[in-house]
């Protein structure tokens, strides 16, 4: 049996591993992937149940703001964003959500 998984997309955060640990401490497997993951690469991952867009202070690279691919929004995965104001997610947080907020997200997607 394969594990359910939350994908964390790195959009310039320094706290990706903190979020991954928080999710794992809640009993759910997570993986960190780069912001420019393609639709095909994401769909090739097993048992993805939700996505966290994790922005941060390192969002600008070579004068360009790091963006998530717009096509990812149309895939039907539940998504939340952390410190990524451009997102089109159901829930947006300015800072790392507490365990209660993260549990609410996980229960929303039935994990």
Protein language model features and the residues they cover:
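N-terminal beta1-alpha1 cap of cysteine-dependent amidohydrolase-like domains
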Residues: 1-108
């Amino acid at each position: 049996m394969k594990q359910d998984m939350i994908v964390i997309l790195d959009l310039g955060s320094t706290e990706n591993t903190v979020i991954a640990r928080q999710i794992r401490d809640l009993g759910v497997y997570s993986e960190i992937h780069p912001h420019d993951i393609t639709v095909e690469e994401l769909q090739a991952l097993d048992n993805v149940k939700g996505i966290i867009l994790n922005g941060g202070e390192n969002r600008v690279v070579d004068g360009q703001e790091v963006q998530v691919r717009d096509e990812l929004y149309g895939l039907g995965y539940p998504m939340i964003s952390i410190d990524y104001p451009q997102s089109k997610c159901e829930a947006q947080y300015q800072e790392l959500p507490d365990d209660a907020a993260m549990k609410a997200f996980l229960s929303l997607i039935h994990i």
